[in-house]
Swiss-Prot record:
GO terms of biological process kind: prolyl-tRNA aminoacylation
A GO term for molecular function: ATP binding
HAMAP family hit by this protein: Pro_tRNA_synth_type1
Protein name: Proline--tRNA ligase
Domain notes: Consists of three domains: the N-terminal catalytic domain, the editing domain and the C-terminal anticodon-binding domain.
GO cellular component: cytosol
UniProt function note: Catalyzes the attachment of proline to tRNA(Pro) in a two-step reaction: proline is first activated by ATP to form Pro-AMP and then transferred to the acceptor end of tRNA(Pro). As ProRS can inadvertently accommodate and process non-cognate amino acids such as alanine and cysteine, to avoid such errors it has two additional distinct editing activities against alanine. One activity is designated as 'pretransfer' editing and involves the tRNA(Pro)-independent hydrolysis of activated Ala-AMP.
Superkingdom classification of source: Bacteria
NCBIfam families linked: PRK09194.1, proS_fam_II
Main location, first listed in the record: cytoplasm
Catalytic activity: tRNA(Pro) + L-proline + ATP = L-prolyl-tRNA(Pro) + AMP + diphosphate
Source species: Limosilactobacillus fermentum (strain NBRC 3956 / LMG 18251)
Entry similarity comment: Belongs to the class-II aminoacyl-tRNA synthetase family. ProS type 1 subfamily.
Amino acid sequence: MKQSQMLIPTQKEAPADAEVLSHKMMVRAGYIYQVSAGVWAYLPLAYRVIRKIEQIIREEMDKAGAVEMLLPGLLPADLWKESGRYEAYGDNLFKLKDRRERDFILGPTHEETVTSILRDAIHSYKKLPLVVYQLQDKYRDEDRPRYGILRGKEFEMLDGYSFSADQAGLDQAYDLQAKAYRNIFDRIGLDYKVILADSGTMGGKNSQEFSAPAAIGEDVIAYTDGDYAANLEKATTKFTPTKQIGEEAELTKKATPGAHTVDEAAESLGLEASQILKSMVFLAKFEGEELKPVMVLMRGNDEVNETKVASYLGCEELLMASEEDTEKYLGAHPGSLGPIGVKEDVTILADQHLQGMINMALGANDDGYHYINANFNRDFKVDQFGDFRTVQEGETAPDGLPIKFTNGIEIGHIFKLGTHYSEVFGATVLDQNGRDVPMIMGCYGIGVSRLLSAISEQNADENGLVWPQAVAPFDIHVIPVNAKKEDQMAMAEGITANLEEAGYEVLVDDRKERAGVKFADADLIGVPIRVTVGKKAGEGIVEIKIRKTGETLEVHKEELATNIAILLKQTAE
């Protein structure tokens, strides 16, 4: 492919609003163009990368027994209203009306649609298990699109769905998809971690997330040097209950004027923050019910993990109580809250690390006052102990090793959805005993377009992009130093033809530009191997440069293909 025939609008400077390396380099290298905030055009180079990623995905999906289909991006809102997600998605959902005032959405995902199709198409267990997938654009009305294509309003995804007649079928499909995802990311050349994750608005109980470590990642991964890895919302520590040691002292109420935080209360009482019992109040939203107040207790130096609390309660949404709410239910404002004397309609949850603690300090539900020497059972009761805290770096993970933190970009997610959607839409089959049973579902997704950002973040340098060979837009970039010199152009065309005949994808820079411009653009574009045809063209000698390492070597044109094959194999390892 001649570079003069390609649309590659390289730039010397990055956009002023570009915050991260991948955004800067993909714009500068002419891969993407911003049409609007959060809306991007994928120019020819980027689209070539996407097509290669798609091909790897299709090959691995075929191996896993999944079949490709294509669902509409424009979806009737009725399906989403039926599932309850029309409201649950909130402002992130693109909503529109047709000319007859019927409600539609632009699909961010397709559980409702595919379940309704399978409901009408499959009626017997004999047609199951079945796994379908698609590669399609999704839409999400992001409040703050950022980081280029990493978080946009339109993005391409692989989304797959499995349907089984029993749990064994779901487990098998889930495991096959998990293996396929690992194969996909391995082939692409990404560094990634498979982590335990929360299912969020997708529903279901079991899920794994595939995350690519990167400084700009919006997820925090808690991991060890062993096998343990989880996102911060799901991460746990190795916990051993402690027995109560010492005697319970007399409950005493003390004035703590101006103490509105744990640290201020600790200073006022002459205690450590860990000796303060922190009381956080939430309102839990359950389907068809009024908001229910929930108090969560934990050590003053710990943080409440709202995802864990919501998961334990099984609520649709967990809201932080306002000052008005806390005054309504507890008669006090934040900073003076505690579990002693609360109304019976307030559910009290306590983090498991509080077990065994005695003579704690806590809010008295009276502004400006705290209790000291408060104890479980004697002074107040809790409805349930559990893991409701956010882990801290350095703590011991379940595998016995210290927890480390790193940021990560979510690149894939797989869920065991169970029967939630099939029950909502009546997607049932007759089982072996002739009974109607709901199909058991799994859901699987890869952010195809955001993979470009993840790959770029892990591989780019100060000079430009550095693509792994498996997904690079071209295998080789041939650069005649001076396009005006016939011997250089003739040699460049000759080796390009030979390399293409050998099966390589070659970009040849036939532009009448200065050598410095060509080399700078080549570094920006990031093709794995650069072949420079220069002053030694008359001798049949060219220079090979490995983009990843910067190493160079001179070879005779007759040995070029052999050397490139060796180098590409080495760079792929």
